[in-house]
Amino acid sequence: MRCRRLALGLGFSLLSGIALWSLWIYMETWLPFSYVPYYLPCPEIFNMKLQYKGEKPFQPVTRSPHPQPKLLEQRPTELLTLTPWLAPIVSEGTFNPELLQHIYQPLNLTIGLTVFAVGKYTRFVQHFLESAEQFFMQGYQVYYYIFTNDPAGIPRVPLGPGRLLSIIPIQRHSRWEEISTRRMETISRHIAQRAHREVDYLFCVDVDMVFRNPWGPETLGDLVAAIHPGYYAVPRQQFPYERRHISTAFVAENEGDFYYGGAVFGGRVAKVYEFTTGCHMAILADKANGIMAAWQEESHLNRRFISHKPSKVLSPEYLWDDRKPQPPSLKLIRFSTLDKATSWLRS
């Protein structure tokens, strides 16, 4: 009798083990899963996969040598209009604003605009907002997000119909480099917590700039980058990329298309979430290795745009430096920096 009970017990244990093993195999093989960083309370639409079972890991664009596209490739007074990966390069004369209004206006879009006004940079908010109210996405719903350590220092600027402003308190860090590297994290968190419910597109720009001419739906795209005004006419070997191999922002001498400015980027809100999260993860990896990229977040932004190509590129008329004379190749300036004492502002 005892032998019989022992045999039955062993048989039951064996069957249970087989059943559990079969269930585990089924879950591993047939049930997909996705991963979201634990600190982001993302809704389902932002449950963006890193890798699904049954798929090969995502491989970014292969780092292979290729000729550098030149913005002034056609003539010194004419800009290139298409990248080698067939993304349009937007500049005056490459689009019909009236036609675009007819296409985009019925879609009832809301466009978000983020700026950081930390410390002495609050002094630029009024001029920035007044110029945005005059030129940025006229006829569309706009949501301004101002991140600041001094909410009381943000001036109240009258806004037009369908245009809202939200002041979001953030911590001030002692070093401006730390503020810069935290920007991607802050935008990523904000999208996950709020912006995905409030806007369709999101642009992230610097506050110490002003709009000087209309900025409209010609800039809308999945992932949008702006060419830096200081490097649009130089070979990529002179771009201020991060050249140290130890950094995740490393770019080889034979890599790169354009040098993009960190002062302007944007796109569909889901794509901006992916982009800022990717940059933030790379910054964290560098921090763990005790390294800070040459130009902080701008170095990581350029590294990511090499492996994740922008779907639309804005010419330097959307990111100009007022200290430079306007070249013949730019018919007008839409968005430009203000002349300022940078050392005083960052002190």
UniProtKB/Swiss-Prot annotation:
Mn(2+) binds at residues 206, 208. Residues 1-5 are cytoplasmic. It is found in: Golgi apparatus membrane. Binds 1 Mn(2+) ion per subunit. InterPro entries: Glyco_trans_6, Nucleotide-diphossugar_trans. It is an enzyme of class 2 (transferase). The active site is at residue 298. Its EC number is 2.4.1.88. GO terms for molecular function: globoside alpha-N-acetylgalactosaminyltransferase activity; metal ion binding. It holds the Pfam family Glyco_transf_6. Keywords: Glycoprotein, Glycosyltransferase, Golgi apparatus, Manganese, Membrane, Metal-binding, Signal-anchor, Transferase, Transmembrane, Transmembrane helix. It catalyses: a globoside Gb4Cer (d18:1(4E)) + UDP-N-acetyl-alpha-D-galactosamine = a globoside Forssman (d18:1(4E)) + UDP + H(+); a globoside Gb4Cer + UDP-N-acetyl-alpha-D-galactosamine = a globoside IV3GalNAc-Gb4Cer + UDP + H(+). It comes from the Eukaryota. One of its GO terms (biological process) is lipid glycosylation. GO terms for cellular component: Golgi apparatus; Golgi membrane; vesicle. The conserved DXD motif is involved in cofactor binding. The manganese ion interacts with the beta-phosphate group of UDP and may also have a role in catalysis. This is Globoside alpha-1,3-N-acetylgalactosaminyltransferase 1. It comes from Canis lupus familiaris (Dog). The gene is GBGT1.
